[in-house]
Amino acid sequence: DSHCGAFAVICMVLLAMTQWSAFLSMEAAPLLPLALIPVASRASAAMAVLSLRPMRTSQYSAMERGGAPVFVAAALLAAACALPIVLWSSFAPLAAAIGYGLAVWYGFRQFEGMSGDISGFGLVLGELCGAVVLALGR
Protein backbone atom coordinates (compact mmCIF):
# COMPACT_ATOMS: atom_id res chain seq x y z
CA ASP A 1 0.00 0.00 0.00
CA SER A 2 1.48 3.32 -0.99
CA HIS A 3 -0.17 5.04 2.00
CA CYS A 4 1.46 2.74 4.55
CA GLY A 5 4.15 4.47 6.59
CA ALA A 6 7.62 3.19 7.35
CA PHE A 7 6.86 2.72 11.04
CA ALA A 8 3.80 0.62 10.21
CA VAL A 9 5.97 -1.66 8.07
CA ILE A 10 8.59 -1.90 10.82
CA CYS A 11 5.91 -2.75 13.40
CA MET A 12 4.45 -5.41 11.09
CA VAL A 13 7.86 -7.02 10.62
CA LEU A 14 8.50 -6.98 14.38
CA LEU A 15 5.06 -8.49 15.02
CA ALA A 16 5.65 -11.26 12.47
CA MET A 17 9.12 -12.03 13.85
CA THR A 18 7.83 -12.18 17.43
CA GLN A 19 4.95 -14.47 16.46
CA TRP A 20 7.30 -16.68 14.45
CA SER A 21 9.69 -16.94 17.38
CA ALA A 22 6.91 -17.70 19.85
CA PHE A 23 5.33 -20.42 17.73
CA LEU A 24 8.69 -21.94 16.84
CA SER A 25 9.66 -22.28 20.49
CA MET A 26 6.52 -24.05 21.73
CA GLU A 27 7.08 -27.57 20.45
CA ALA A 28 5.74 -29.36 23.53
CA ALA A 29 3.03 -26.85 24.47
CA PRO A 30 -0.47 -28.24 25.04
CA LEU A 31 -2.79 -27.48 22.14
CA LEU A 32 -5.98 -26.56 24.00
CA PRO A 33 -4.53 -23.43 25.63
CA LEU A 34 -3.23 -22.44 22.19
CA ALA A 35 -6.70 -22.98 20.72
CA LEU A 36 -8.31 -20.93 23.51
CA ILE A 37 -6.13 -17.85 22.91
CA PRO A 38 -8.34 -16.62 20.01
CA VAL A 39 -11.47 -17.53 21.99
CA ALA A 40 -10.34 -15.34 24.89
CA SER A 41 -9.36 -12.43 22.66
CA ARG A 42 -12.63 -12.60 20.66
CA ALA A 43 -14.72 -12.81 23.84
CA SER A 44 -12.84 -9.75 25.10
CA ALA A 45 -13.59 -8.03 21.79
CA ALA A 46 -17.29 -8.82 22.13
CA MET A 47 -17.32 -7.36 25.62
CA ALA A 48 -15.54 -4.21 24.45
CA VAL A 49 -17.78 -3.67 21.43
CA LEU A 50 -20.93 -4.20 23.49
CA SER A 51 -19.93 -2.08 26.47
CA LEU A 52 -17.60 0.74 25.35
CA ARG A 53 -18.81 3.97 23.79
CA PRO A 54 -18.18 3.95 20.02
CA MET A 55 -16.40 6.73 18.17
CA ARG A 56 -18.77 9.00 16.27
CA THR A 57 -17.11 8.06 12.97
CA SER A 58 -17.10 4.31 13.69
CA GLN A 59 -19.44 1.77 12.14
CA TYR A 60 -20.27 0.78 15.73
CA SER A 61 -22.03 4.12 16.30
CA ALA A 62 -24.86 3.03 13.99
CA MET A 63 -25.06 -0.44 15.53
CA GLU A 64 -28.22 -1.27 17.42
CA ARG A 65 -27.60 -2.39 20.96
CA GLY A 66 -29.23 -5.68 21.75
CA GLY A 67 -28.57 -9.25 20.78
CA ALA A 68 -26.33 -11.24 23.06
CA PRO A 69 -25.83 -9.53 26.40
CA VAL A 70 -22.38 -8.72 27.71
CA PHE A 71 -22.59 -11.43 30.38
CA VAL A 72 -22.59 -14.14 27.68
CA ALA A 73 -19.24 -12.88 26.39
CA ALA A 74 -18.01 -12.53 29.98
CA ALA A 75 -18.97 -16.13 30.77
CA LEU A 76 -17.21 -17.38 27.64
CA LEU A 77 -14.13 -15.33 28.54
CA ALA A 78 -14.11 -16.68 32.10
CA ALA A 79 -14.36 -20.27 30.87
CA ALA A 80 -11.67 -19.78 28.21
CA CYS A 81 -9.30 -18.32 30.80
CA ALA A 82 -10.07 -20.64 33.73
CA LEU A 83 -10.01 -24.01 31.95
CA PRO A 84 -6.32 -23.89 30.89
CA ILE A 85 -5.27 -22.58 34.31
CA VAL A 86 -6.97 -25.48 36.08
CA LEU A 87 -6.02 -28.25 33.65
CA TRP A 88 -2.54 -27.24 32.43
CA SER A 89 -1.44 -24.32 34.63
CA SER A 90 -1.37 -22.23 31.45
CA PHE A 91 -2.08 -18.52 31.64
CA ALA A 92 -1.93 -17.99 27.86
CA PRO A 93 -5.64 -17.21 27.25
CA LEU A 94 -5.67 -14.94 30.30
CA ALA A 95 -2.61 -13.15 28.91
CA ALA A 96 -4.42 -12.74 25.58
CA ALA A 97 -7.42 -11.19 27.34
CA ILE A 98 -5.20 -8.87 29.40
CA GLY A 99 -3.18 -7.89 26.33
CA TYR A 100 -6.39 -7.17 24.44
CA GLY A 101 -7.73 -5.10 27.32
CA LEU A 102 -4.57 -3.01 27.63
CA ALA A 103 -4.37 -2.36 23.88
CA VAL A 104 -8.05 -1.37 23.70
CA TRP A 105 -7.71 0.82 26.79
CA TYR A 106 -4.84 2.66 25.08
CA GLY A 107 -6.68 3.01 21.76
CA PHE A 108 -9.95 4.02 23.43
CA ARG A 109 -8.20 6.79 25.35
CA GLN A 110 -6.27 8.01 22.30
CA PHE A 111 -9.27 8.16 19.97
CA GLU A 112 -12.01 8.84 22.53
CA GLY A 113 -14.17 5.90 21.56
CA MET A 114 -14.26 2.34 20.30
CA SER A 115 -13.89 1.36 16.64
CA GLY A 116 -13.22 -1.73 14.59
CA ASP A 117 -9.63 -0.64 14.05
CA ILE A 118 -9.07 -0.39 17.80
CA SER A 119 -10.62 -3.82 18.26
CA GLY A 120 -8.37 -5.29 15.55
CA PHE A 121 -5.34 -3.62 17.15
CA GLY A 122 -6.30 -5.22 20.45
CA LEU A 123 -6.87 -8.64 18.88
CA VAL A 124 -3.45 -8.72 17.24
CA LEU A 125 -1.59 -7.60 20.35
CA GLY A 126 -3.69 -9.75 22.68
CA GLU A 127 -3.07 -12.90 20.68
CA LEU A 128 0.63 -12.06 20.52
CA CYS A 129 0.68 -11.77 24.33
CA GLY A 130 -1.05 -15.14 24.64
CA ALA A 131 1.38 -16.84 22.26
CA VAL A 132 4.42 -15.39 24.04
CA VAL A 133 3.12 -16.44 27.47
CA LEU A 134 2.39 -19.95 26.16
CA ALA A 135 5.90 -20.18 24.70
CA LEU A 136 7.53 -18.91 27.89
CA GLY A 137 5.38 -21.03 30.19
CA ARG A 138 6.16 -24.45 28.79
Locations of the language-model features?
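Transmembrane alpha-helical segments that form the membrane-embedded catalytic/substrate-channel core
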Residues: 36-51, 97-107
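Solvent-exposed interhelical
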Residues: 43-77, 110-114
